[in-house]
Amino acid sequence: MPFGIIDTRNDAPLAGTEYLIRDDSASSLPDVDGIDTILVPQPSDDDPNDPLLWPTWKREIAFATLFFNNIIFAALPGPMLAPSTFALAGILGVPVTMISELSGYQLLIVGAIGPLVSVLAQKYGKRPQFLFAAVTGTIGTIICIIGSQRYNYNTLLAGRMIQGLGTTAWESLSMSAVGDLLYLHERGLRTAFMVATLTCTPSIVSIISGAMTQACGWQSLFVASLPFNIVGLIGTIFLLPETQFRRSPPRLRSVSEKPVEMAQGAEKPELSVVEMAGPTSQPQKPRQTYLQTLAPMSGTYTDKGILHLLSEIFVHLANPAVIWILLVSGVLIALFVVSAYITSQIWSVPPYNLNIAQNGFFYTGSFLGGLLATVAGPLCDWTARTLTRLNHGIFEAEFRIPIMIIGAVFTALGWFTFMWDVEHPRPNGYLLGAFCHGAACFGISVPSTAAGLYILDSFPKQSTEIFILQMMLKNFLFYAFSTFINSWTAEDGAGFVFRTWGIVSLCLLATSIPMYIFGKVNRRMMSNVHAKYRIFRAVA
């Protein structure tokens, strides 16, 4: 039982249990330039087109393109109108709820087409989905420009919904693309950056959009974002090759003998260890030229049909780990993001009386909180590596979970202090509110990073579908709350809303305790289920 994790006493290979720190029993495995970190997953030995074998600069450029476009197409559109929600209701002559629905319907589209994007990515690769998303995101912005210039709510709503078509692929596939590009020990910081695009950058967008709306008018927001859309589209075409790869299954072995450093009485670990099989009997495949990598499609990556793949997505809901990530990441992020629907409603009235620009500057707190939360990735790597060393070089995916404690502390600090602040209104109370919003942002980003890494480590082959489910739940919640949260806040008060957020958040984070203890048992159980039952064997 390594550090409270219940062991299953089974020698069969298991994803998420790996030799990560070199010892004598792993001496045949490639490492990182002589350092004692073993490469997980093992790269191809006969195909230089494996993304894991790309030059470092090429992988970093691909990641930078993912990161930039995640901001431009996924993070930017939603909060763009948040600071001016209250003011736009008067400008367009519609209720505040209808202004919130400009974002709500957009996010409903994102969630609704998520399964289709997932199966198309599995079948034809991620690049076609990214290209489609970049094109539709740009077209949606153009339609929003037309609608805003005409003060036409319906045209503006249509543009926002088309922007939603351009959001789905970036929000749902970027995290699994990180798993395509990087080894296990390289993912922490990059995963934290990807989480930050959804928790941190919306805040800086709100800050900038509030100031721009106050100075230049709300129509300028869409005009200013169009050049960034075009740059993102060009970057997708020329800098983001296909990251999906059909890697030949490595030859696996289970380790029946204890590593030499282990004590005689130690329990025998179950390991997923890759041996190099020596020189391959097949000739090495030719490296693709740059022009070949620009092709919109590069073939198919599975022999399954679209309907078959579509039906498989929801099978993953039988996995307790999937339910867990939906709770500690999907729901928590949704609660934080929908708070943007009501902040303008809170601060635009006495005793605060903030204007549109000042409503935007309120998000400075959450921006700083999200920025500081990028340490969650390296911290998660450090804790996992430390526990791995103490565990005789054997990595368990559950070593990602302990930093959830930090998330729980800051989430509680943020929401419950925010509750007290709005229940005791003062003219400068928005300053404490900004701090609370930042603390909540930090507290939510940490568990989201840890949960994302846990899924990439434990269920790498199913990560695309799992992140799609997470994205669907999150965006359906966004839409659902947009239909009633403004009226709920007006009736029961913002303090009641934030108290509810705090209680729900702590209850959901508490599920990390059984996941840490029984996570390995669950991984073994799901591995057995995948092997035994046909429907699960198909998704595995």
Stretches with model-predicted labels:
Residues 1-77, 90:
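Cytosolic juxtamembrane N-terminal segment immediately preceding the first transmembrane helix
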Residues 112-153:
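Conserved MFS/SLC helix-loop-helix module at the cytosolic interface between two early adjacent transmembrane helices
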Residues 151-160, 221-222, 325, 429-434:
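Short hydrophobic/alpha-helical segments at membrane-entry points of transmembrane helices
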Residues 74-75, 104-107, 111, 118, ...:
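C-terminal transmembrane bundle
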Residues 186-216, 220-223, 227-232, 236, ...:
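Glycine-rich segments within core transmembrane alpha-helices of 12-TM secondary carriers
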Residues 159-198:
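Cytoplasmic helix-loop-helix junction between adjacent transmembrane helices
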